[in-house]
From Swiss-Prot:
UniProt record, GO biological process: glycogen catabolic process
Family: Belongs to the glycosyl hydrolase 13 family.
Single GO molecular function: glycogen debranching enzyme activity
Its biological purpose: Removes maltotriose and maltotetraose chains that are attached by 1,6-alpha-linkage to the limit dextrin main chain, generating a debranched limit dextrin.
Broad class of enzyme this protein falls into: hydrolase
Protein name: Glycogen debranching enzyme
Catalytic activity annotation: Hydrolysis of (1->6)-alpha-D-glucosidic linkages to branches with degrees of polymerization of three or four glucose residues in limit dextrin
Keyword Nucleus carried by entry: no
Keyword DNA damage part of the UniProt annotation: no
Pathway(s) served: Glycan degradation; glycogen degradation
Residue ranges of the region described as Disordered: 460-479
């Protein structure tokens, strides 16, 4: 039997050098680590890792080749009260594995035990890691490096974006390959998108609870192997990495960046009753935030929380991020529940992971976007992230919906959100682009559902409609559900136009949810994380070409307005913005606080957004000059106007002089 050489303690993971494979694994509390390799017949061969440098266990297997399947058995104490849950009867995934063979099914053998260890061996059914070798021709690929001030983000799901697209070949729909297909790239270019933000593509598992209900985790926020691509999105699991990189290369050639939604806050091992896949059995005490009683701090709502203040976990997370940038050429990250990244356990801007990213010559150069909260006390941290980060701006989302759909927002608050929420983000030398403005996202109602439903309808999720937020700030315009009279359809259309205009012509970085530009509906489900079906797949055959054209025209218009593209904070008297009332006069203090919902926003001294968010048709006196409506508002109903615009109820128009 081949003997393991001591090998090297770096880098983490399994790495082929042309002669064999070096294996390394971190565990500060293990007493012994076995490397388990499996031959073509599934026969297991075990080797003790002979090297032990600090907290890194390592060994070198001569003559091992790419394609080798492996896992680990980690020996140590079973002391739940102290946070130790070692169980060598369970085969464990390498946290740095780049490919996984097998499925993460709901099976009792994939659990370690709660109070007492489960000593039944699970190697026969446990997923295995696969050694891979990386050879890829990037040709002349270069990151677009779109300036933040010019960035337009499009949030999409790999499968849902193309699975029903009639112009994409059937055999690649819903895959990484489809992202790089000319039809999809041309669509994104014509729409005006500069960055495609993908929901998680790192390998994830469906929660046992969902599997028992016949559902699956669709969004992917349940990671199990952070260095491995989710194989279900590949035409062939063996070529997933190349398929993904082919798509990125094609998108880059078109000038479109790729941003990955990444989950560094928890793992698919869930709570103490959850499955044992990897980290819990390798070094539970180090990888997770552990309470005094040995249970997990559940600051994520998912059962566990990664301890990103531990030096080894910081190294792991940093290596993961560098891998996606260096190996896959991604252009940035959106961090799910990103407040966890700054926990020490209190949130700090100089937390270890933030510092590591700041000091990294690779990671400090890519786009970084935070979902700036978690569910722990002090978890709402909007505006408090380090300067390198942009942040999801939920202030903008709620203000836009309240202004146009609930009619209960003062003009002053609306204007503040329109101006990149400077009260929140204008600090620590940050720019307006730090505010990622959104009206909708994957989590919540789609834009169409915002104007068709007053209440969530999540019954299909199997939780008796208890899941999902009740704070939607939506308005069904008098009838719950899709369809209705022509008048109802038109009023809903006008509200959609108003919300899109507010999003795409405001200061900050706009993020558009895929499908909103052609009227996609989830039939009132505002938490469709477990709906891998026609509820979430974009139906291109039913897309509204008129709404798509309207959205594209708005994005094109945005790119013509210097005040929105220069990424500088607006200052009084700088010519970037003037706020006027219906008579083209500066608003008084009382009008800002209590005035009617009528407003004129003059941008760069020649683009005018006239707003009438009241229930009545209202005359709006335009500033001096000859004004004409511009696309997407130009038409027979909007000729050249020199003095007054008849503003329809809940309407707006954009003019140029």
């Amino acid at each position: 039997m081949t003997q393991l050489a001591i090998g090297k303690p770096t880098p983490l993971g399994a790495h082929y050098d042309g002669q064999g494979v070096n294996f390394t694994l971190f565990s500060a509390h293990a007493e012994r680590v076995e490397l388990c390799v499996f031959d073509a017949n599934g026969q297991e061969h075990r080797y003790d890792l002979p090297g032990h440098s600090g907290d890194i266990w390592h060994g070198y297997l001569p003559d091992a080749r790419p394609g080798l399947r492996y896992g680990y058995r980690v020996h140590g104490p079973w002391q739940p009260a102290e946070g130790h849950r070692f169980n060598p009867a369970k085969l464990l995934i390498d946290p740095c594995a780049r490919q996984i063979d097998g499925e993460f099914k709901d099976n009792p053998l994939l659990h370690a035990g709660h109070n007492e260890p489960d000593y039944r061996d699970n190697a026969s059914i446990a997923p295995k890691c696969v050694v891979v070798v990386d050879h890829y021709d990037w040709e002349d690929d270069a990151p677009p490096r779109t300036p933040w001030g010019s960035t337009i983000i499009y949030e999409a799901h790999v499968k849902g974006l193309t699975y029903l697209h009639p112009e994409i070949p059937v055999e690649i729909r819903g895959t990484y390959k489809a992202l790089g297909h000319p039809v999809m790239i041309n669509y994104l270019k014509q729409l005006g998108i500069t960055a495609l933000e993908l929901l998680p593509v790192a390998q994830f598992a469906s929660e046992p609870r969902l599997q028992r209900m016949g559902l699956s985790n669709y969004w992917g926020y349940n990671p199990v192997a952070m260095f491995a691509l989710h194989p279900a999105y590949a035409c062939s699991p063996e070529t997933a990495l190349d398929e993904f990189r082919d798509a990125i290369k094609a998108l880059h050639k078109a000038g479109i960046e790729v941003i990955l939604d990444i989950v560094l806050n928890h793992s698919a091992e869930l709570d103490l009753d959850g499955p044992l896949f990897s980290l819990r059995g390798i070094d539970n005490r180090s990888y997770y935030w552990i309470r005094e009683d040995g249970d997990y701090h559940n600051w994520t709502g998912c059962g566990n929380t990664l301890n990103l203040s531990h030096p080894a976990v910081v190294d792991y997370a940093s290596a993961c991020l560098r891998y996606w940038v260096e190996t896959c050429h991604v252009d940035g990250f959106r961090f799910d529940l990103a407040a966890v990244m700054g926990r020490t356990p209190e949130f700090r801007q100089d937390a270890p992971l933030f510092t590591a990213i700041q000091n990294c010559p690779v990671l400090s150069q890519v786009k970084l976007i935070a979902e700036p909260w978690d569910i722990a006390p002090g978890g709402y941290q909007v505006g408090n992230f380090p300067p390198l980060f942009a942040e999801w701006n939920d202030h903008f989302r709620d203000a836009a919906r309240r202004f146009w759909l609930h009619y209960d927002l003062p003009l002053g608050v609306f204007a503040g959100r329109f101006a990149a929420s400077s009260d929140v983000f204008k600090r620590n030398d940050r720019l307006p682009s730090a505010a990622i403005n959104l009206v909708t996202a994957h989590d919540g109602f789609t834009l169409r559902d915002c104007v068709c439903f007053n209440h969530k309808h999540n019954e299909a999720n199997g939780e008796e409609n208890r899941d999902g937020t009740n704070n939607n700030y939506s308005n069904n315009h008098g009838k719950e559900g899709l369809g209705g009279t022509l008048d109802l359809v038109e009023r809903r259309r006008d509200s959609i136009h108003a919300l899109l205009t507010t999003l795409l012509l405001s200061q900050g970085t706009p993020m558009l949810l895929a499908g909103d530009e052609h009227g996609h509906s989830q039939h009132g489900n505002n938490n469709a994380y477990c709906q891998d079906n026609q509820l979430t797949w974009l139906d291109w055959s039913q897309a509204s070409s008129g709404l798509t054209a309207f959205t594209a025209a708005l994005i094109h218009l945005r790119k013509r307005i210097p005040a929105l593209m220069e990424n500088r904070w607006w200052e009084e008297g700088d010519g970037n913005v003037r706020w006027l009332n219906r008579y083209a006069q500066p608003l008084s203090t009382d009008e800002w606080q209590n005035g009617p919902k009528q407003l004129q926003i003059l941008l760069s001294d020649r683009f005018l957004i006239a707003i009438n968010a009241t229930l009545e048709v209202t005359e709006i006196v335009l500033p001096a000059g000859e004004w004409h409506a511009i696309p997407p508002f130009a038409g027979e109903d909007n000729p050249v106007i020199t003095a007054v615009w008849q503003g329809p109820a809940h309407g707006l128009c954009v003019f140029q002089r």
